[in-house]
Amino acid sequence: MRRNEYTHRRRHISNRHLSDKYYYAGEHETATGIRLTQYNEQSLHTKEVRITDTSFSKLSDSDQIDWFEVSGLTNADAITRIVKDFGLHNLDAKDILTPQHVVKVEEYKGRMLIVLNSCYYDVNNEMRSEHISILVANNTVITFTESNNPVFEAAHKALLSNMLNIRKKGSGLLLAFLLNTIIANLVESASKVEEILEDIEE
């Protein structure tokens, strides 16, 4: 246990300095997995992506919207490869791999990276925190989460039902749905905490 704690502390400290390589500094042990959802007005399909794929950007289809869901940040090398494959930098990978990072939005030419933290209630009605990053590169959206909990299930349902003609629109509307899901989770969590506090006061 002490060795694990020391390793966690060492990795957390290493992410504070400039480096060619960073590590996931969180507590989740979820193995990194990648799911790709591609859609347009006529079709929608989802598949698993191998982490060993040499180029993730080549999996994108310019005629569709491509949504890569990266669940689990333990494979820091894969996270870094994805980030660099879409034209970002090692420091951006560092932000993605560092939970409780200050909320930030980085804009590059044709790309944007959003880093934030959220919380939600799981199926067991327990509050969970989640470090989330969203990378947008033209028609490609990549979400990074610490766990494989269905944080963006509402967005998937919107795609399946084609809510607000989402499959006809660009990646901007998908981003809006993802951010709306995060905000909804925060509002729900705040409401439940408020109810708990009111019960305690009574």
Predicted features along the sequence, with ranges:
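Peripheral, non-transmembrane regulatory/ligand-interaction domains of membrane transport proteins
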Residues: 1-202
